[in-house]
Amino acid sequence: EFAKSLDSNLNATFFTCSLNAAIEFAHHPSIEVVMIGDKVSKDSMLTTGASAVQTIESIQADLCILGINSLDTQFGLSENDWEVVQIKKAMIKASKKTICIGISEKLNSQQKIKVANLDEIDILITELDPNDPALLPFKHKGLTIY
């Protein structure tokens, strides 16, 4: 959904491991798409693997935009797939800012494997109004909410 919502005048380069995002970005007239990775995780539709992590580690990105599986004010960002976790960790480390996008039912939940502490995330985007009381704990932890 994020890729579909981009301004048609946006001129940018997106490095992505997401097959779905790459397809959407490719339809945009002024976006260059760089697909990273070699092995496809069928559950997440992301490319994963050591070569993907190594490629990401060589990039300096302005923004890291992540879809979330679980986000909790105490445990942080978490996932249940080890290889996806390694990709997301590398992406966060390679970026100046991190944006997490997810539906509200993913909030206040935890998966088995930690990706990042909450203080490594700058912005949270959900379908909720930014002033919704459910988002208040995330604001108190320093996240900007949209």
Summary of predicted features, one role per range:
Residues 1-7:
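Glycine-rich beta-alpha loop segments
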Residues 8-10, 28-29:
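Short helix-capping segments at alpha-helix termini
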Residues 9-14, 120-123:
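Short active-site oxyanion
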